[in-house]
Amino acid sequence: NYHYVTKIMTDRIKEPFSLVVFDHHTDMQKPMIEGLTSCGDWAGKVIKDNPYICQLILVGPEKKDINAIGLRSNKLITYSAQEIRAEAMESKTNQIDLSVPVYISIDKDVLDESISETNWSQGHMKLGTLEHMLGIIIRNQKVLGIDICGECDTNMPLPEYMEDEEKNGDCLLYTSDAAD
């Protein structure tokens, strides 16, 4: 629920950088209330307002959601869920600027429900795919920071909550190992 904290973190970066966002949603909707940053619009604000952002690389939304983004920018590179499943990402990799460090933000809703439970609609990315992509980034670029968000619904019955928390904990450990 607090993916917009990434904007707060990246606002502190005072050098050119790229932001890599793994998310089932674009987080680039028009703001519902002008001047208020939310989980639905924070990424659009980063690309428009942060003077140090070189690229925002968005990984995981459905193609139809990417097409609905109102913001057009040469700083935005997208990899749809469909491109990832088809392993058709190579055509865009030459657009990625490897000369600047990256900040990585992961919303666990990009992952399949069998791996992680969140309180939003979820994608179908496998943990191995996320680990592979993180490995490529971490091996090739300086990483300024990483954040992970996307928790399960705290209002669900306790047995389901405990099961989902266990899944999420396993996911965090796996992701942490990938970053090492």
Kindly give the residue locations of the regions a language model identified.
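Active-site rim beta-loop-alpha module in soluble metabolic enzymes
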Residues: 57-117
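C-terminal accessory extensions appended to soluble enzyme cores
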Residues: 165-169
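Short amphipathic alpha-helices and their capping/turn segments at secondary-structure boundaries
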Residues: 2-15, 88-100, 131-139
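A short alpha/beta connector and helix-capping loop motif
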Residues: 18, 34-47, 113-153
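Acidic carboxylate-rich catalytic motifs and surrounding loops in phosphoryl-/glycosyl-chemistry enzymes
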Residues: 57-65, 144-159
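Conserved small/polar residues in nucleotide/adenosyl-binding loops
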Residues: 174-180
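Active-site flanking residues adjacent to catalytic metal/cofactor-binding acidic residues
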Residues: 22, 104-108, 179
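Active-site histidine-anchored catalytic micro-motif
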Residues: 1-63
